[in-house]
From Swiss-Prot:
<comment type="function">
    <text>Essential for recycling GMP and indirectly, cGMP.</text>
</comment>
<dbReference type="GO" id="GO:0004385">
    <property type="term" value="F:guanylate kinase activity"/>
</dbReference>
<keyword id="KW-0808">Transferase</keyword>
<feature type="domain" description="Guanylate kinase-like">
    <location>
        <begin position="6"/>
        <end position="185"/>
    </location>
</feature>
<keyword id="KW-0547">Nucleotide-binding</keyword>
<keyword id="KW-0067">ATP-binding</keyword>
<comment type="similarity">
    <text>Belongs to the guanylate kinase family.</text>
</comment>
<dbReference type="InterPro" id="IPR020590">
    <property type="entry name" value="Guanylate_kinase_CS"/>
</dbReference>
<dbReference type="GO" id="GO:0005829">
    <property type="term" value="C:cytosol"/>
</dbReference>
<keyword id="KW-0963">Cytoplasm</keyword>
<dbReference type="GO" id="GO:0005524">
    <property type="term" value="F:ATP binding"/>
</dbReference>
<dbReference type="InterPro" id="IPR017665">
    <property type="entry name" value="Guanylate_kinase"/>
</dbReference>
<feature type="binding site">
    <location>
        <begin position="13"/>
        <end position="20"/>
    </location>
    <ligand>
        <name>ATP</name>
    </ligand>
</feature>
<dbReference type="InterPro" id="IPR008145">
    <property type="entry name" value="GK/Ca_channel_bsu"/>
</dbReference>
<dbReference type="InterPro" id="IPR027417">
    <property type="entry name" value="P-loop_NTPase"/>
</dbReference>
<dbReference type="InterPro" id="IPR008144">
    <property type="entry name" value="Guanylate_kin-like_dom"/>
</dbReference>
<dbReference type="Pfam" id="PF00625">
    <property type="entry name" value="Guanylate_kin"/>
</dbReference>
Amino acid sequence: MKNERGLLIVMSGPSGVGKGTVRKALFSQPDINLHYSVSVTTRKPREGEVEGVDYFFRTREQFEQMIRENKLLEWAEYVGNYYGTPIDYVEKTLAEGKDVFLEIEVQGAMKVRRAFPEALFIFLAPPSLTELEKRIMGRGTESKELIENRLRAAKEELEMMDEYDYVVENDEVELACERIKAIVIAEHCRRERVAERYKRMLGVE
């Protein structure tokens, strides 16, 4: 039994952990009933990334205008690029009783936590630091300096794990997806969420 308002699910984790890979695999499954909120970024598209599907790619000037116009639920600057979440889609979809899935950076997740304390926060973790370094270096699209910056930032982000509700280890993509699906199902059965609907049915404040 679902709440009338949708559940906001926020997944984040360090650079190189495989957030995009897990999200794409999750949304390719036929039984998934989540609505993905596409983020905005000023970084260059990577090979295979599609405008409006993976990200909305914008210039710094365009992004900063969105900040000034309060069009972002959260935004952060990470390794020299802006990342943010358009607010209109999130609010509209939640109000329709649909679950919204955000795949965002750790800095941004902490801002969403302050705005939506009732949201579900999942930290995607690597099986080891060695594996994380291998994944970041294996992209082959970034300079040595940028790789070092990402590694440094990733280690700092791992220390933020305590701020999340659940931790999912991304040792295998399919297993990570199954864990996330199980967490979402369990969260919808949480007493606090279910009780609110019954209180409304019974006319109890």
